[in-house]
UniProtKB/Swiss-Prot annotation:
The keyword Transcription applies. It comes from the Bacteria. PANTHER family: TRANSCRIPTION ELONGATION FACTOR GREA. Necessary for efficient RNA polymerase transcription elongation past template-encoded arresting sites. The arresting sites in DNA have the property of trapping a certain fraction of elongating RNA polymerases that pass through, resulting in locked ternary complexes. Cleavage of the nascent transcript by cleavage factors such as GreA or GreB allows the resumption of elongation from the new 3'terminus. GreA releases sequences of 2 to 3 nucleotides. One of its GO terms (molecular function) is DNA binding. Residues 46-73 form a coiled coil. The gene is greA. GO terms for biological process: DNA-templated transcription elongation; regulation of DNA-templated transcription elongation. This is Transcription elongation factor GreA. InterPro entries: GreA/GreB_C_sf, Tscrpt_elong_fac_GreA, Tscrpt_elong_fac_GreA/B, Tscrpt_elong_fac_GreA/B_C, Tscrpt_elong_fac_GreA/B_fam, Tscrpt_elong_fac_GreA/B_N, Tscrpt_elong_fac_GreA/B_N_sf.
Length: 159
């Protein structure tokens, strides 16, 4: 199995999600099932079936997160060679060559990606175009509406 790259922040978020599922959701669902069973006939007990369905989902999510945690490779961007190259974990400021607008993204793992927080997946078209390039380079991003040319203004190595 391949390692899954993740930032230290992303690893902590996954660990927190797992802890919440195990320590909050799982016990609550067990209690919901116990209460629903007390209502009698389980064949037509909607509360029981809903709780069992939620239990199945939560247990599946726990297994999924545990697998990811066992396979993840935490990358501390502050310990990387700070040579101005775009790599996993770096925060990159770009300038659109058409309208000179600036945008800043951090390249993160799949589970951490959130465009509303300017965090893009390392597998996204933008990140793929940026990886390995350095400050001052121009990159072409293959987008659904056509190619976009960006100039890399800065590459920062912080968490």
């Amino acid at each position: 199995m391949n390692n899954i790259p993740v930032t230290a922040f992303g690893a902590k978020a996954l660990e927190a999600a797992l802890l919440k599922l195990k320590d909050v959701s799982r016990p609550r669902i067990i209690e919901d099932i116990r209460i629903a069973r007390a209502h009698g006939d389980l064949k037509e007990n909607a509360e029981y079936h809903a709780a069992k369905e939620e239990q199945s989902f939560v247990e599946g999510r726990i297994k999924e997160i545990e697998l990811k945690l066992s396979r993840m490779q935490i990358i501390d961007v502050t310990k990387l060679s700070q040579d101005g190259r775009c790599v996993f974990g770096t925060t990159i400021t770009l300038m659109n060559s058409v309208d000179n607008s600036e945008i800043t993204y951090q390249i993160v793992g799949e589970d951490e990606a959130d465009i509303s927080l300017d965090k893009i997946s390392c597998h996204s078209p933008i990140a793929s175009a940026l990886m390995g390039n350095e400050e001052g380079d121009k990159v072409i991003v293959k987008a659904p509406k056509g190619d976009i040319v960006y100039k890399i203004l800065s590459v920062e190595y912080y968490i």
